[in-house]
Amino acid sequence: MSTNIIYCFSGTGNCLDFAQNLAKVLGDTDIVMMRSEPVVTDATAAKRVGFVFPCHGGGLPEGLEECIKSVKISPDAYVFGISQSASYLGTGLYKLNKIHHLDYWKGTTHQCSCIWLFPHTMMLPPVPPKFAQKRSEKLAVKIAKEILAGKVTEKAPPCNPFNAVESKVWPKLVVKKSRKLAVNKDTCESCGQCAKLCPKGNIKYVDGKPVFGANCIQCLGCLQYCPTESIYMGRKTQKREHYHNPNIKAIDLMQTLIHID
């Protein structure tokens, strides 16, 4: 087992890119993806164990809490958590800290990927995509150095009451919005990427075109990575510019484990 393990959930690449940038500085790191059940849950031999994930509806992405609970960590390990969102911290780190005590945690911001809610430029502070990416890369290096130094965050992650309520309402909203997932059959090239990318197997091909089920968790990888931008979720998403991390390809998100020396 590697010296470091980072458990990562990423829908459109920002969190995976951040995890990889952390790993490049930490060295000897396994990045275990949590888009579905992690392939490695026994992390007791790792010196450092981290979690990198986005904020979905004020909280953790659907199903992620169960994945986190399945991970076994040595009581001597240094544990850290990074939550990435477009604006606010959410309750993800608070929930993570209740499961695995965090020695270090940090909230970061990047471009918004929830295209049906906001355009991707809707982030705080508002900055151009290229600047946001460079800032994210520099911050990952800074955080990785703090982790290597064993820095400890004195205060526990907060729980914002508004976000706590929001995270309880979010699943119902997701079900409603997911019913609007559709494809433009005229422009769809039937490449099959969306079905392979979906962490829940929610996309099936019928007569050569994707059909969406009712088990969407709003990672939105299918929509944001569609090479012909044929997938949409209501009129707003047809008008707004699509976005995914420039350094992460769809095939990268399909991996279950990525090792970085």
Q: Residue spans of the language-model regions?
A:
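Short secondary-structure boundary/hinge segments and terminal tails
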Residues: 40, 113, 206, 234, ...
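Flexible mid-to-C-terminal extensions adjoining Fe-S/redox cofactors in radical SAM and related proteins
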Residues: 223-224, 228-261
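Short alpha-helix adjacent to the SAM-binding motif of class I
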Residues: 17-18
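Iron-sulfur cluster-binding cysteine motifs and their immediate structural context
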Residues: 183-184, 189-217, 221-238
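FMN-binding flavodoxin-like domain, especially the glycine-rich phosphate-binding loop
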Residues: 2-6, 12-14, 23-36, 43-53, ...
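Poly-acidic low-complexity segments
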Residues: 41-42, 129, 184-185, 211-213, ...
